[in-house]
A protein has these predicted regions:
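GH16 jelly-roll
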Residues: 24, 28-295
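Low-complexity, intrinsically disordered regions enriched in charged/polar residues
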Residues: 9-10, 182
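Bacterial N-terminal signal peptides that target proteins for export
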Residues: 1-8
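C-terminal motif of bacterial Sec signal peptides marking the signal peptidase cleavage site
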Residues: 16-18
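Bacterial signal peptide processing site
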Residues: 20-22
Length: 295
């Protein structure tokens, strides 16, 4: 989910000429087969490529969404109906579109007119920021399979207000568009690699038949050498992005703090590509937890 969003994702292996390494896989990856772009091994400290590197990572922050209220210490609302750079149709509200109950957060998209918008939803930003770690979000996508919604779990660089998007960097931990059910997307954006240029790093559609019916864990293993995106278990890697051998702020803006975002967009350049089916509202994305583990 881009700050300023999106045409249909461009499959990662179709732009190998750009200065990064990425791969799409159904199996765990040990490396990416791009001879001149492979990230160099670390020269100091632990080997981040070691199979057991993450075994002793410790939980440093989480929100388990227990209780009946959203934590004001952890989250803040981002509101408005400016289209969000993607011609989205919702008006993000700070009340009425979020519920915490039975151990989960519910983000609720509704069909209702508010300030000239036909729909309302919620967009939550974390107040805390993180650099590197094992990131996990366990969530369930809205069950109705009609067209028009665009749920996302993602991160943005904390310098977005000074450098803008895409220079701040974006890490899409999970995106889903409801006109294409049973599929999920993982994507990375930077100045060098973004949808405007048609060079965003993406998994493309990853089949996941139970995405609308069951909770799944969407994770990222994030170091200063790579980002590996997975579903449910760390060995189920779906996108492996290595830091370019010749890296700079244009192609690797990912060695600084990022914050979380969770939202349901409605319509827009990607989510609304095939229109909006009003029968699917209210549409609810449930989040069981957000967890950050670090070494």
């Amino acid at each position: 989910m881009l700050k300023y969003r999106l045409s249909i994702p461009f499959i990662a292996f179709s732009f190998m000429a750009s200065c990064q390494s990425a791969s799409i896989t159904e199996e765990p990856l040990e490396s990416v087969l791009q001879e001149n772009l492979e990230a160099p091994p670390p020269t100091t400290g632990e080997d981040v490529f070691a199979p057991d590197y993450w075994d002793d990572a410790e939980l440093v922050w989480s929100d388990e969404f227990d209780g009946t209220e959203l934590s004001q210490e952890n989250w803040k609302f981002e509101t408005g109906n400016n289209g969000w750079g993607n011609n989205e149709l919702q008006n993000y509200q700070n009340e009425g579109n979020v519920e915490v109950s039975n151990g989960t957060l519910k983000i609720i998209a509704k069909k209702e007119n508010v300030d000239g918008s036909m729909y309302t939803s919620a967009r939550l930003n974390s107040k805390k920021e993180f650099t590197f770690g094992k990131i996990e979000i366990r969530a369930k996508i809205p069950e109705d399979k009609g067209k028009g919604i665009w749920p996302a779990l993602w991160m943005l660089g904390n310098n977005i207000n000074s450098v803008g998007w895409p220079a701040c960097g974006e890490i899409d931990i999970m995106e889903y568009v409801s006109y294409s059910p049973n599929e999920v997307h993982f994507t990375i954006h930077s100045t060098a690699n973004n949808h405007v240029k048609g060079t965003q790093i993406t998994s493309g559609p990853v089949p996941l038949e139970t995405i609308e019916e069951e909770f799944h864990t969407y994770g990222v293993l994030w170091t200063d050498k790579y980002m590996k995106f997975y579903i449910d278990t760390e060995d189920n890697i779906k996108l492996n992005f290595l830091r370019p051998n010749i890296s700079n702020s244009d192609n690797w803006p990912f060695s600084k703090p990022f914050y979380f975002l969770m939202n349901i967009a409605i319509g827009g350049n990607w989510g609304g590509l095939e229109g909006v089916d009003d029968s699917i509202f209210p549409a609810v994305m449930e989040v069981d937890y957000v967890r950050v583990y670090q070494k």
